[in-house]
Amino acid sequence: MELTPREKDKLLIFTAALLAERRRARGLKLNYPETVALITAALMEGARDGKTVAELMSEGTRILGRDEVMEGVPEMISNIQVEVTFPDGTKLITVHNPVV
């Protein structure tokens, strides 16, 4: 199976997000890469579900709380930017202060 670099990136994000979901379900606090992957995957799936850019930007701040991530992680992530494919094309989503 041949995958484009973009498809490989999507699979890597999905895999990291899946690991983060499992760790979160066990009550573990997420580290920086797990936090970014989980939020990024949620944004990508939201676009697939038909949500708008504005909806995703708003929802992106409610995916994880400060109590679900390791100390210092919220301060490390001032924003997350993701290029997401919508039915009408690819758009850049920016979520400011994603972990509140």
From Swiss-Prot:
Keywords: Cytoplasm, Hydrolase. GO terms for biological process: urea catabolic process. The keyword Glycosyltransferase does not apply. GO terms for cellular component: cytoplasm. It catalyses: urea + 2 H2O + H(+) = hydrogencarbonate + 2 NH4(+). InterPro entries: Urease_gamma (IPR012010), Urease_gamma/gamma-beta_su (IPR002026), Urease_gamma_sf (IPR036463), Urease_subunit (IPR050069). Gene3D superfamilies: Urease, gamma-like subunit (3.30.280.10). Its EC number is 3.5.1.5. Pathway: Nitrogen metabolism; urea degradation; CO(2) and NH(3) from urea (urease route): step 1/1. It is found in: Cytoplasm. The keyword DNA-binding does not apply. GO terms for molecular function: nickel cation binding; urease activity. Pfam families: Urease_gamma. Signal peptide: none annotated. Heterotrimer of UreA (gamma), UreB (beta) and UreC (alpha) subunits. Three heterotrimers associate to form the active enzyme. Belongs to the urease gamma subunit family. This is Urease subunit gamma. It comes from Bordetella bronchiseptica (strain ATCC BAA-588 / NCTC 13252 / RB50) (Alcaligenes bronchisepticus). The gene is ureA.
